[in-house]
């Protein structure tokens, strides 16, 4: 397929950034207000996690003993997580929340979202407000909220982190995509450490300075690095992602004694 340059599909509405799309080869990408890629889909393999940050955001699977019953996504984008979860975690229910109706419309029309029903629902709402309705009944929260220029402020404030912690089940995990080059990055980390009582891990993505930051409702039962390596073997085979690379990234970026993490 010939390369198609970024083009505007929907004009900005109600203060939201305009939504655009581009295609290069078999990769279709979503943009918000600029040519920066926010989400991508492989047209031949729609469930593939094309962007490195989206793969890093699956690193939480290393630390869970039971597959999640429910996952909340704040920021639908092009539906990368929705497609992957529908394919690889088919028994997990998903709720995807996005404030921008244009993003939702384009994702439905052009990004092969899962069937909307009991297992997958889309909510048009402010994710920071919507998460307040949950009380200890969602197992994983995936946050990927950019406005085309930077992280959405409401999604990096302490009140939002507290609401997310209140929403998580007893062994729940919060995962967010941040950019390490943001001058406020360390401030965001300190807020998260405060709310989750130090149970935070950073996993750098393979490119572009993105970091998948994970925060844990309670200490993961398995923190032994050798045992996590064995778990990485099983996960890599099951899900087609490089969990050994993820584990190495976690080990290099977080305090440990070479044998255990300290969460």
UniProtKB/Swiss-Prot annotation:
Gene3D superfamilies: Vaccinia Virus protein VP39. S-methyl-5'-thioadenosine binds at residues 98, 126-127. PROSITE patterns: PABS_2 (PS51006). GO terms for biological process: polyamine biosynthetic process; spermidine biosynthetic process. It is found in: Cytoplasm. Residues 1-221 form the PABS domain. It catalyses: S-adenosyl 3-(methylsulfanyl)propylamine + putrescine = S-methyl-5'-thioadenosine + spermidine + H(+). Keywords: Cytoplasm, Polyamine biosynthesis, Spermidine biosynthesis, Transferase. SUPFAM superfamilies: S-adenosyl-L-methionine-dependent methyltransferases. It is an enzyme of class 2 (transferase). The keyword tRNA processing does not apply. The active site is at 144 (proton acceptor). One of its GO terms (cellular component) is cytoplasm. Its EC number is 2.5.1.16. HAMAP family: Spermidine_synth (MF_00198). Belongs to the spermidine/spermine synthase family. Catalyzes the irreversible transfer of a propylamine group from the amino donor S-adenosylmethioninamine (decarboxy-AdoMet) to putrescine (1,4-diaminobutane) to yield spermidine. Homodimer or homotetramer. This is Polyamine aminopropyltransferase.
């Amino acid at each position: 397929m010939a390369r198609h340059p970024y083009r505007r599909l929907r004009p900005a509405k109600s203060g939201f950034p305009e939504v655009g799309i581009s295609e290069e080869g078999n990769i279709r990408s979503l943009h918000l207000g600029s040519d920066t890629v926010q989400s991508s889909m492989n047209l031949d393999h729609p469930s593939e996690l094309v962007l490195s940050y989206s793969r890093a955001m699956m690193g939480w699977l290393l630390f869970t003993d039971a597959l999640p019953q429910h996952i909340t996504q704040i920021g639908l984008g092009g539906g990368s997580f929705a497609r992957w979860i529908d394919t690889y975690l088919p028994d997990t229910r998903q709720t995807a929340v996005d404030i921008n109706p244009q993003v939702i419309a384009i994702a439905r029309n052009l990004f092969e979202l899962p069937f909307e029903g009991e297992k997958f629902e889309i909510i048009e709402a402010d994710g920071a407000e919507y998460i307040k309705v949950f009380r200890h009944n969602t197992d994983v929260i995936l946050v990927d909220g950019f406005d085309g220029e930077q992280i959405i402020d409401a999604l990096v404030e302490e009140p939002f982190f507290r609401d997310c912690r209140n929403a998580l089940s007893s062994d729940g995990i919060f995962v967010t995509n941040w950019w390490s080059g943001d001058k406020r990055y360390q401030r965001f980390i300190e807020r998260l450490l405060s709310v989750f009582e130090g149970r935070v891990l950073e996993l750098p993505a393979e490119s572009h300075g993105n970091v998948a930051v994970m925060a844990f409702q309670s200490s993961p039962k398995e923190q032994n690095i050798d045992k996590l390596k064995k778990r990485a073997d099983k996960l890599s085979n099951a899900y087609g992602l490089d969990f050994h690379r993820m584990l190495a990234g976690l080990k290099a970026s977080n305090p440990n004694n070479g044998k255990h993490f300290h969460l």
